[in-house]
């Protein structure tokens, strides 16, 4: 272990213990400010950091050119030509950082930096594909931030015990084939050869697209990461929600990624003449379903916490201006970090639906469509994120990720943790998506320090 690294790890450990025991707030703040950096490469105010914020900004701005749209955001759909061009740029960045690059059978890109010991891999990264008319920060921050961490380590001649790998997961957004987190899902063993014949809107199969990537679809399952291969996975990401921005907190410690359940509901009444049917004799499916939608919102809002419930659309039949709707179809989606809470809320929603059935003389039946269990972040990794942020004097907030992430899949096979940086006004999946360069630099510096802390703390037995 080089001297700078040893001094940093010894000092951060002792200082954090002392800071947490300080009962007088000014003393605690002074204590935190005394934690030194690993090496002097850059200063922000009175704090010295290792990542080069201008270099990181430059790579993010360059990446935003691939698929740029007139609104100022990007459309960089997974497996598209713009995605392929962006991937080539990322591969060259990895190679210039001295990483050994490989692409697995699912199209995931890995850049490896050797460690000094034969230990499991510390993996970190994100994705670079976007939604239609998306923003410049979702996925990109964690991808470019991961490469910047490696470049900063090269600058400081830092060596690690564990091998380090930066990963760019393919097709996280799922615009093709209706399969989000596709690359990470294959890597985690959750998706296999059964998905190869799924077609997109152009009639092309996943196998067709993989061949365009230069991959052999028959070897798709070779992309699975073997059990025990990873010491942990870290993902730096924008929050995509409002909480950090509202509270002016620079770093989010992600407790886990919420689970979700989705139902398809059908309300059946009786289609009848709109002019001749008295109001008190109507069995209006659309009116009843509209009450159901409001009931979902009211029940979800009634509980404390960060649970959310959504009805994304409604279809009414027969859909004529002069006919009372006899059928109305709508979905219900519930998300929370606690599956039991989702189930409890759903029970209350169903009770409200039963009341509305009686009031409107209709019947409503709901069928479970999809269920994803929550993915909890590893406690040791959460602690390392807090320690790294404290060493920089950065406040943290514990919060869940309400959006699906690649980390949710990798949590099935390895300890996982996520670092959030604020999203201005909570906007994401939009050209107006924005995170400040300072917040992004803070997140990358925290990632840098977390990698070193985990490298020091893990696999000591």
Task: List the predicted regions and their residue ranges.
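N-terminal capping segment at the start of a domain
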Residues: 45-80, 372, 427-429
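Catalytic-core environment of secreted peptidases
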Residues: 97, 109-141, 146
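A short beta-alpha structural unit
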Residues: 78, 310-319, 331-337, 363-382, ...
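Zn-dependent metallopeptidase/amidohydrolase metal-coordination segment
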Residues: 48, 66-69, 122-126, 396-446, ...
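Alpha-helical metal-binding/catalytic segments enriched in His/Glu/Asp
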Residues: 124, 134-172, 263-267, 276-299, ...
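N-terminal secretory signal peptides and thylakoid transit peptides that target proteins
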Residues: 2-19, 23-26
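A non-catalytic alpha/beta surface segment that caps or lines the substrate-entry region
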Residues: 68-114
């Amino acid at each position: 272990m080089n001297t700078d690294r040893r001094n940093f790890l010894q000092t951060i450990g002792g200082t954090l213990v002392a800071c947490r025991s300080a009962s007088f707030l000014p003393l605690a703040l002074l204590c935190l400010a005394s934690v030194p950096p690993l090496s002097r490469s850059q200063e922000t105010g009175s704090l010295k950091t290792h990542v080069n914020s201008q270099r990181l900004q430059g790579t993010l701005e360059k990446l935003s050119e691939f698929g740029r749209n007139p609104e100022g955001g990007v459309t960089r759909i997974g497996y598209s030509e713009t995605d392929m061009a962006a991937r080539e740029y990322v591969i060259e960045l990895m190679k210039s950082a001295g990483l050994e690059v490989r692409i697995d059978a699912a199209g995931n890109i890995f850049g490896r930096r050797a460690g000094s010991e034969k230990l499991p891999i510390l993996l970190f990264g994100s994705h670079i594909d976007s939604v239609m008319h998306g923003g410049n920060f979702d996925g990109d921050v964690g991808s470019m931030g991961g490469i910047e961490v490696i470049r900063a380590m090269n600058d400081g001649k830092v060596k690690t015990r564990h091998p380090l790998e930066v990963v760019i997961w393919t097709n996280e957004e799922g615009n093709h084939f209706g399969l989000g987190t596709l690359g990470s899902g294959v890597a985690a063993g959750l998706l296999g050869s059964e998905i190869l014949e799924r077609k997109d809107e152009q009639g092309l199969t996943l196998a067709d697209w993989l061949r365009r990537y230069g991959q052999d679809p028959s070897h798709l399952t070779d992309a699975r990461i073997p059990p025990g291969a990873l010491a942990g996975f870290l993902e730096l990401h924008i929050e995509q929600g409002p909480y950090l921005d509202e509270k002016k907190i620079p770093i989010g410690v992600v407790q886990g990624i919420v689970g979700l359940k989705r139902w398809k509901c059908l309300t059946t009444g009786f289609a009848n003449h709109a002019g001749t049917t008295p109001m008190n004799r109507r069995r209006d499916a659309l009116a009843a379903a509209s009450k159901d939608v409001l009931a979902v919102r009211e029940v979800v809002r009634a509980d404390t916490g960060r649970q959310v419930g959504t009805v994304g659309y409604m279809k009414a039949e027969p859909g004529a201006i002069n006919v009372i709707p006899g059928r109305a179809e709508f979905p219900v989606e519930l998300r929370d970090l606690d599956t039991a809470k989702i189930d409890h809320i759903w029970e209350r929603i169903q009770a409200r639906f039963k009341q509305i059935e009686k009031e409107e003389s209709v019947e409503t039946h709901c069928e479970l469509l999809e269920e994803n269990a929550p993915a909890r972040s590893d406690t040791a990794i959460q602690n390392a994120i807090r320690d790294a942020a404290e060493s920089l004097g950065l406040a943290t907030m514990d919060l869940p990720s309400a959006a699906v992430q690649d980390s949710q899949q990798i949590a099935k096979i390895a300890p996982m943790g996520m670092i959030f940086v604020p999203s201005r006004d909570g906007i994401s999946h939009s050209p107006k998506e924005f995170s400040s360069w300072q917040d992004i630099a803070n997140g990358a510096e925290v990632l840098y320090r977390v990698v070193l802390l985990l490298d020091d703390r893990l696999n000591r037995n």
